[in-house]
Design a protein with these regions (language model features):
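Secreted/periplasmic carbohydrate-active enzymes, especially glycoside hydrolases
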Residues: 1-186, 191-194, 198, 202, ...
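Proline/serine/threonine-rich low-complexity linkers at boundaries of modular beta-sandwich domains
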Residues: 1-2, 254-263
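A eukaryote-biased signal for short, well-structured alpha-helical docking elements
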Residues: 235-237, 241-252
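Catalytic-core region of carbohydrate-active enzymes that cleave or remodel glycosidic bonds
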Residues: 192-224, 242, 253, 257
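Short, structured coil/loop segments at alpha-helix boundaries
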Residues: 60, 164, 230, 244-248
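Generic secondary-structure boundary/loop-capping signal
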Residues: 129, 221, 236-238
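Substrate-binding cleft/loops of secretory-pathway carbohydrate-active enzymes
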Residues: 223-232
Length: 341
């Protein structure tokens, strides 16, 4: 018996209907029995919504139709169906695999079977439609979609911050909070160097459950932020330091730019003394107004520019150190004590 999760599925939406086509993996042997395919209402096993049986001679044209399907709708509604399938397969003899000379009409197919295996599939099915319309933009299920995309690198197999799966789950939770809705897996071949196909499928499954698009947008934006930095690498776009623990200032910049979660974050790398002896500091926030206090006294408030998460405060007076700064935005506040400039 084999348990698998790699049944190929293509979907097409039209007039409130979902047309599905199932494709067996190329490595499968000959189908010897009826292949049963079922689709259940949710990934935890709810109501049965489709049951199909396909004879061996139909293996190259297995289709299904769902009326009024529940669509996967990104982070708004990351709905997935559960697909189950089972059938008996036979691995063929080496001579037949290599295109033996025996006439197919004269040979008995059963004589070429070396082994019979019962195969079961259990995997998720997300039904949705992504389209890029020239001069109009990107649409998910016919609604305009604004991509908030990052490139993702797999973590080490195991480290002091947990196993790879534990780290991926933690990463995706952080990316949800950041407001990301598209993840592009970096690497070549299977998607990442040193990662097997099963791990890549598990990663994509976790992404679907959290509402991330993966691999649907083929054009790679310039200066795409990268989630995980590498040892010895210097990139201002990395969102997580190479230690696997520390979120960088760029993470909070994009969180303030993309997330619906309230953000107020002083970018300490921008704190510096100007040529005139006064001080400058940039604060990232998605609030409408940020107020800055210097040594407990109101210094300045700034209103947000459209789509810009940066609030740049210049000419901050400093009579002596330590300098006490405090910022407020909405219901958020944060205080800083500066001892060195």
């Amino acid at each position: 018996m084999q348990m698998r999760d790699d049944l190929g599925i293509t979907t097409k939406l039209e007039n409130g209907k979902a047309y599905l086509e199932f494709v067996l993996p190329e490595t499968m042997g000959r189908l010897l029995s009826v292949l049963q395919i079922e689709i259940w209402e949710d990934a935890d096993g709810g109501r049965l919504v489709f049951h199909g049986e396909y004879a061996p001679e139909e293996a190259d044209s297995m289709t299904a139709l769902l009326l009024r399907p529940h669509l996967w709708d990104g982070v708004r509604d990351p709905y997935v169906y559960l697909l189950k399938a089972q059938g008996r397969f036979g691995s063929v003899e080496y001579g037949e695999k290599m295109g033996g000379t025996k006439n197919e009409e004269e040979s008995d197919p059963s004589e070429d079977i070396a082994e019979i295996v019962e195969v079961f599939w259990r995997q998720e099915l997300a039904i949705y439609d992504v389209r890029v319309v020239d001069k109009k933009g990107i649409f998910l299920n016919e609604k305009e979609f604004l991509p908030h995309e990052v490139a993702y690198r797999f973590p080490p197999q195991i480290s002091d911050v947990g196993t790879r799966v534990e780290q991926v789950r933690r990463d995706l939770e952080r990316l949800v909070r950041m407001g990301v809705n598209v993840i592009r897996l970096e690497g070549t071949g299977t998607g990442a160097e040193g990662v097997n196909c099963s791990e890549v499928r598990t990663f994509y499954s976790l992404c679907r459950k959290r509402g991330f698009l993966t691999g649907d947008l083929w054009i790679r934006p310039k200066n795409l932020p990268v989630y995980r930095g590498l040892p010895g690498e210097t990139t201002c776009q990395a969102l997580l330091a190479a230690d696997g623990r520390t979120l960088t200032e760029r993470y909070y910049y994009y969180q303030a730019k993309w997330s619906s979660e309230s953000v107020l974050y002083p970018a300490l790398s921008t704190l510096h003394r100007q040529e005139n002896g006064l001080v400058s500091l940039t604060i990232y926030s998605n609030q409408k107004k940020v107020v800055l206090y210097v040594d407990g006294v109101l210094f300045l408030f700034q209103s947000a520019a459209s789509g810009d998460p940066e609030f740049i405060f210049e000419d901050i007076p400093v009579e002596k150190l330590p300098l006490h700064l405090a910022a407020e935005a909405g219901n958020l506040s944060i205080s800083l004590t500066v001892t060195k400039l």
